[in-house]
């Protein structure tokens, strides 16, 4: 067969005409075309690299030929894989947004900061807005406390201060204007509506809640409470009772508040587990039971996600564990259930009763007679983008009227910290 077909003669001609220097080119070309055909067999469009059906557009054909010759096998494979990864990124990966150049919109940002410094609606009390810069949208604040110290009452004060346009001031003996009214949703998980309402009336009128509950008014207190009731009636302040809630319930109620009332500020009282959350998490995890600290972290994470997704402000709270009694540096380690709750918050503080040891350590400051004797201390342990953290605000408190008044600031070592009382005034719809 070999001789009949003159194979020896054919091999000699091939040897004479062969160009060894071109071998690598044609071998590489063969591998590139084989690669493209392999992708094509799996239904992947590779015509953006090489289109064999293009016979009319000679310029495009020549350009693709040149690119194919000048591209390595690895580069061609990477071009195709990049397109596949882009599809996965858009439709499979649960990630939103893209990377931007660091200077993108930088001058617009500076112009905006010149007109609108970063601040939110003011919270109640002196010094607190210096520390927090107000209730900023897209931020999650956590204010924890031991039972009976005032976490609910302090949030009642803040919610009313944001939503109501007048409060009673004993200093002037009259009602004073309180800026504009911002829509607020107060989610209560333990108290019912009536309990929340009497605390709100007490704060606005500066009348002790017991006087309201027992209908035992002094002087003009009844008139002040009636005026406070009128203010509440006309304010965009909404109460939602949610005693047994899931993560989805919290998000749904906030979405409903945004949709129905244009709510921008949410107070959630407070972070703890419930039967419904346990059932929801067990169902989502395929029957695997998670520890309480993991569940509480998930709730905290959900609240922060809601802040970012819907552009709202959220404040919540937690109980404390037993270590708070002896702690010299009250921080996230005192949060009941899981210190990881604080990982997602933008501002974290803890309310504690002032102890005798505190007063002894404060003798030098209190001896100046510049401040009243404090009854509550507020430890600020976390403050993103804030100057003041690792400090204590010393307050005088009247929990009967839900009013906690910071007076001065110290380090954890009781050293006085200079601090100005910044006032935030909103005279038009908040731009924050």
Where are these regions (language model features)?
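Accessory, often N-terminal, substrate/partner-engagement and coupling regions
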Residues: 1-83
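The Walker A/P-loop phosphate-binding site
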Residues: 92-207
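Cytosolic-facing regulatory segments adjacent to core modules
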Residues: 122, 129-131, 165-262, 388, ...
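Short, contiguous acidic/charged loop-to-helix segments that flank catalytic cores in large enzymes
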Residues: 146, 241-244, 276-297, 323-341, ...
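Structural recognition of the conserved hydrophobic beta-strand(s) that form the central parallel beta-sheet
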Residues: 186, 267-268, 312-318
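Phosphate-binding/switch loop-helix module in NTP-utilizing enzymes
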Residues: 237-306
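C-terminal regions of RecA-like/P-loop NTPase motor modules
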Residues: 247-263, 308-310, 322-432
């Amino acid at each position: 067969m070999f001789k009949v077909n003159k194979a020896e003669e054919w091999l000699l001609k091939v040897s004479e005409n062969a160009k060894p220097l071109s071998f690598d080119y044609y071998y590489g070309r063969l591998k590139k075309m084989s690669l493209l055909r392999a992708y094509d067999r799996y239904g992947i469009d590779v015509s953006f690299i090489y289109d064999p059906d293009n016979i009319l557009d000679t310029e495009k054909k020549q350009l693709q030929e040149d690119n194919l010759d000048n591209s390595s096998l690895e580069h061609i494979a990477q071009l195709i894989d990049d397109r596949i990864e882009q599809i996965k990124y858009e439709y499979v990966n649960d990630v939103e947004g893209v990377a931007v150049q660091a200077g993108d919109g930088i001058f617009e940002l500076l112009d905006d900061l010149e007109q609108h410094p970063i601040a939110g609606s003011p919270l109640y009390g002196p010094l607190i807005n210096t520390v927090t810069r107000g209730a900023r949208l897209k931020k999650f604040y956590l204010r924890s406390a031991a039972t009976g110290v005032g976490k609910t009452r302090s949030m009642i004060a803040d919610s009313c201060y944001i939503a109501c346009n007048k409060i009673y001031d004993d200093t002037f003996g009259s009602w004073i204007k309180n800026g504009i009214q911002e829509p607020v949703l107060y989610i209560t998980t333990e108290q019912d509506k009536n309990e929340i309402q009497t605390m709100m009336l007490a704060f606005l009128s500066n009348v002790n809640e017991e006087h309201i509950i027992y209908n035992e008014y002094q002087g003009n207190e009844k008139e002040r409470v009636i005026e406070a009731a009128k203010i509440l009636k006309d304010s965009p302040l909404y109460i939602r009772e949610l005693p047994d809630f899931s993560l989805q319930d919290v998000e749904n109620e906030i979405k409903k508040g945004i949709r129905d009332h244009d709510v921008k500020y949410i107070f959630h009282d407070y972070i703890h587990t419930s039967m419904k959350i346990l059932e929801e998490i067990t169902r989502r995890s395929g029957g695997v039971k998670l520890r309480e600290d993991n569940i509480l972290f998930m709730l905290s994470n959900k609240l922060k996600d809601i802040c970012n997704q819907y552009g709202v402000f959220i404040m919540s709270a937690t109980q404390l564990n037993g270590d708070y009694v002896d702690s010299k540096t009250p921080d996230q380690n005192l949060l009941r259930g899981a210190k990881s709750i604080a990982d997602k918050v933008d501002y974290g503080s803890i309310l504690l009763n002032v102890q005798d040891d505190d007063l002894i350590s404060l003798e030098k400051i209190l001896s100046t007679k510049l401040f009243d004797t404090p009854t509550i201390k507020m430890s600020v342990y976390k403050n993103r983008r804030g100057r003041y953290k690792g400090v204590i605000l010393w307050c005088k408190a009247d929990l009967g009227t839900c009013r906690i008044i910071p007076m001065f600031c110290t380090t954890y070592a009781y050293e006085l910290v200079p601090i100005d009382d910044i006032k935030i005034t909103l005279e038009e719809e908040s731009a924050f």
